[in-house]
Curated annotation (Swiss-Prot):
Single GO MF annotation: ATP binding
Motif range ('HIGH' region): 34-44
Keyword presence, Aminoacyl-tRNA synthetase: yes
UniProt motif ('KMSKS' region) ranges: 268-272
Subunit structure: Monomer.
Protein name: Glutamine--tRNA ligase
Reaction(s) this enzyme catalyzes, per UniProt: tRNA(Gln) + L-glutamine + ATP = L-glutaminyl-tRNA(Gln) + AMP + diphosphate
NCBIfam families hit by this protein: glnS, PRK14703.1
UniProt-listed GO biological process terms: glutaminyl-tRNA aminoacylation; glutamyl-tRNA aminoacylation
Annotated source species: Aliivibrio salmonicida (strain LFI1238)
Pfam families in the record: tRNA-synt_1c (PF00749), tRNA-synt_1c_C (PF03950), tRNA-synt_1c_C2 (PF20974)
Length: 552
């Protein structure tokens, strides 16, 4: 995190302040515990900024722990991606990376302890039967017929589960709590199930795996976590979190705190639905710039600083709300307006021939990289007899409000001369193919000598020296603010979320590094694509427009 970024405040930090003041804790230890079954998204970034930010501000520690208890859905690819995302966002974890699988031996021992205390039993109900016996919010659950097995029988069966003597789905270990509890999570939850799957960390050592609610709290305690922070959907699970720790022999007793998850307009956060977008090829992979994944946002041109600023602006509360997508765009727009160098690119070109400019002549102009930051220097831009301008920057006729090039009138070329349109050529379909102009030789960097006013300024590139580029215009992935609420969210995909143009860019951009951000003058903010772009075939992604023009 940048030293210039201000320290936020929220209810969790207020709790921490009180805990330190009262002596409840002498230091702060948080953790970020993703499951490695997908790519991190902007919602995870909020949690990363919260947990790692707290550790930084309180000179504490934050662990990166992979909650890897579901081997069938997890992959080392996701582990590496998550590590890269955390570091790219500007954070680093304390000490070694932690894995819940590091604790499988201890978790097994704690499960045995619960059995020995008569607080866990091996159940042979099917998953459907367990669901049926659990009841509902209006009806209490009912006890499994296997609930009152002896401790000795449960220990023997659990050992046989570990030794692979049972098939998947035929038997499990459940906590013995209260089937009449008003909280369904406390109605004898499953804490171990059988999975014959190779684990990316432990291989084939285990064929039984602990459930999240059993693993999570014990992992926190073993790591000495002082403040276990998660989103509101785990609020009821706090009762199970506390129950497990209160009923095993363990020194540390962390406390769980909940905050509202991020809900962002015009996108979705569900891993299942994001995976559907990828598998159904509705997007081009997890790092598609339209995706809310950290890798997708990064590829689109969002900076780590802009994401951190967004997370700071939206704050941390217990109130569920929908954040405007424009808030995220505002953060990157502010960042790039301040820090991105300027460049010129023409997305829909039409040729301009300056008839009174010498053929073959190449003039090297020095153009400022940033209008308000002279320390960012200048770049060399070649000026030639033939240039490209945007088709939309010329009209044969126009009213006074149109401040661009009009037949018979003048306009200034950015960083160059004043030109006047004198005549045009069209093809058989009536499309303008060439605009013939003349230029005022005395207007480089100064106003016309006779005092006439030239109000408009347009961008351009040299037709001879510019480089062709594929320019991808990305927009919001969905046409409705809350697509997640729809029965079929895919029906609301924005057909114009990606529009590709074949344009031209000034030659200085050929050497730009991947992910480098620029303001294309008068067009928007763009970056070099970090996957497809090469010096021989440039690809630029639109990060955000110069202003918010979305109408929904």
């Amino acid at each position: 995190m940048s030293e210039t970024e201000t320290r936020p405040t929220n209810f969790i930090r207020q709790i921490i302040d009180e805990d330190l003041k009262s002596g409840k804790h002498s230091s702060v230890h948080t953790r970020f515990p993703p499951e490695p079954n997908g790519y991190l998204h902007i919602g995870h970034a909020k949690s990363i900024c919260l947990n790692f930010g707290i550790a930084q501000d309180y000179q504490g520690q934050c662990n990166l722990r992979f909650d890897d208890t579901n081997p069938e859905k997890e992959d080392i690819e996701y582990v590496e991606s998550i590590k890269n995302d955390v570091k790219w966002l500007g954070f680093d974890w304390s000490g070694d990376i932690h894995y819940s699988s590091n604790y499988f031996d201890k978790l097994y021992d704690y499960a045995v302890e619960l059995i020995e205390k008569g607080l866990a039993y091996v159940d042979e109900l099917t998953s459907d039967q367990i669901r049926e016996y659990r009841g509902s919010l209006k009806e209490p659950g009912k006890n499994s017929p296997y609930r009152d097995r002896s401790v000795e029988e449960n220990l023997a069966l659990f050992e046989q589960m570990r030794d692979g003597k049972f098939k998947e789905g035929t038997i499990c270990l459940r906590a013995k709590i209260d089937m009449a509890s008003s909280f369904i999570v406390m109605r004898d939850p499953v804490i171990y199930r059988i999975r014959f799957a190779t684990h990316h960390q432990t291989g084939d050592k285990w064929c039984i795996y602990p459930m999240y609610d059993f693993t999570h709290c014990i992992s926190d305690a073993l790591e000495g976590i002082t403040h276990s922070i998660c989103t509101l959907e785990f609020q009821d699970n706090r009762r199970l979190y506390d129950w497990v720790l209160e009923n095993i022999t363990i020194d540390c007793q962390p406390h769980q705190y909940e905050f509202s998850r991020l809900n962002l307009e015009y996108t979705i956060m569900s891993k299942r639905k994001l995976n559907e977008l990828v598998t159904e090829k509705l997007v081009n992979g997890w790092d598609d710039p339209r995706m809310p994944t950290v890798s997708g946002l990064r590829r689109r041109g969002f900076t780590a600083g802009s994401i951190r600023e967004f997370c700071k602006r939206i704050g941390v509360t217990k109130q569920e709300n929908m954040i405007e997508f424009g808030s995220l765009e505002s953060c990157i727009r502010d960042d790039l307006n301040e820090n991105a160098p300027r460049a010129m690119a023409v997305l829909e070109p039409v040729k301009v021939v300056i008839e009174n400019y010498e053929e073959g002549k190449v003039e090297t102009l020095n153009v400022a990289n940033h209008p308000n930051k002279p320390e960012m220097g200048t770049r060399e831009v070649p000026f030639t007899r033939e240039i490209y301008i945007e088709q939309d920057d010329f009209r044969e006729e126009a009213n006074k409000k149109y401040k661009r090039l009009v037949l018979g009138k003048e306009v200034r070329l950015r960083g160059a001369y004043v030109i006047q349109a004198n005549r045009i050529e069209k093809d058989e379909a009536g499309n303008i193919t060439t605009i013939f102009c003349s230029y005022d030789t005395e207007t480089l960097g100064k106003n016309p000598a006779d005092g006439r006013k030239v109000k408009g300024v347009i961008h351009w590139v040299s037709a001879d020296k510019a480089f062709p580029a594929e320019i991808r215009l990305y927009d919001r992935l969905f046409t409705v603010p809350n697509s997640a609420a729809l029965e079929d969210f895919s029906e609301s995909i924005n057909p114009e979320s990606l529009i590709t143009k074949q344009g031209f860019v000034e030659p200085s951009l050929v050497t730009a590094e991947a992910e480098a951000g620029y303001q294309f003058e008068r067009t928007g903010y763009f970056c070099i694509d970090n996957k497809d772009s090469t010096p021989e075939a440039l690809v630029f992604n639109r990060t955000v427009g110069l202003r918010d023009t979305w109408e929904g």
